[in-house]
Design a protein with these regions (language model features):
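Intrinsically disordered, low-complexity terminal segments enriched in Ser/Thr
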Residues: 2-8
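Intrinsically disordered, low-complexity regulatory regions of eukaryotic regulatory proteins
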Residues: 8-10, 105
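Glycine-rich short-loop/terminal segments
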Residues: 11-16, 28
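Short, hydrophobic/glycine-enriched beta-strand segments
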Residues: 14-23, 48-49
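Acidic/glycine-enriched connector segments
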Residues: 25-188
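Intrinsically disordered, low-complexity regions
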Residues: 193-195
Length: 195
């Protein structure tokens, strides 16, 4: 899980990483901080949400490092967390009810502008899985830190995702299948970057 490139390339200047994760995960271990440090070292742009949990913890870490190449995505005119006083991008949704679909509008836009994803997932959060799916559908690779066994997985295809999902309890896999119809999800792997 702890692999880094030794130098940046010119084409990395335009790399944007979508960072997200479960609201239940608010502590960053050495593995996650190492990956965040790789992002800083390579001067990647970061797009991140404003939720409590992983978003807030990662914002706190980047703020402590003085990292400025970050844009915080918020819904409508309300930004819940922006710990580094970074630029914000406010996303509008046609629905007013602040439910999963409301916040998924912001997630779709972040996935659209990203070139790569870094997700910190507890194996239960459907919002984090939705971010993974959004990125894979656009043939963008995703590094997933899977907190139950503290492992990292680089996903580039639906086959890669299927391997990771097998680590989730069957009750959660059934819930994901109902929510996202994963059995019909198919994406072939494309080349990507390393974090």
């Amino acid at each position: 899980c702890v692999r880094a490139r030794t130098h940046a390339h010119e084409d990395d200047l335009m790399t944007t990483v979508l960072i997200g994760g479960s609201r239940r995960l608010a502590l960053l271990n050495d593995i996650i901080r190492f990956r965040a440090d790789n992002i800083i070292r390579q001067h990647f742009a970061v797009v991140i949400g404003d939720a409590n949990g992983t978003d807030k913890a990662m914002q706190s870490y980047f703020a402590s490092k003085g990292y400025r190449n970050i844009t915080v995505y918020c819904m409508a005119d309300r930004c819940r967390n922006n710990l580094g006083d970074w630029p914000t991008r406010h996303i509008s949704a046609s629905r007013q009810k602040r439910d999963f679909a409301y916040y998924a509008t912001k997630d779709e836009e972040m996935a659209r502008v990203a070139s790569y994803g870094f997700m910190i997932w507890d194996g239960k959060s459907k919002g984090t899985l939705n971010n993974i799916l959004n990125l894979l559908k656009q043939q963008k690779k995703v590094l997933v830190y899977f907190s139950p066994d503290q492992s990292c997985h680089t996903l580039g295809s639906s086959d890669d995702l299927a391997v990771l999902l097998r680590k989730c309890p069957s009750i959660d896999r059934r819930k994901f299948e109902r929510e996202f119809t994963l059995s019909t999800f198919a994406v072939a792997e494309e080349p990507g970057i390393d974090l």
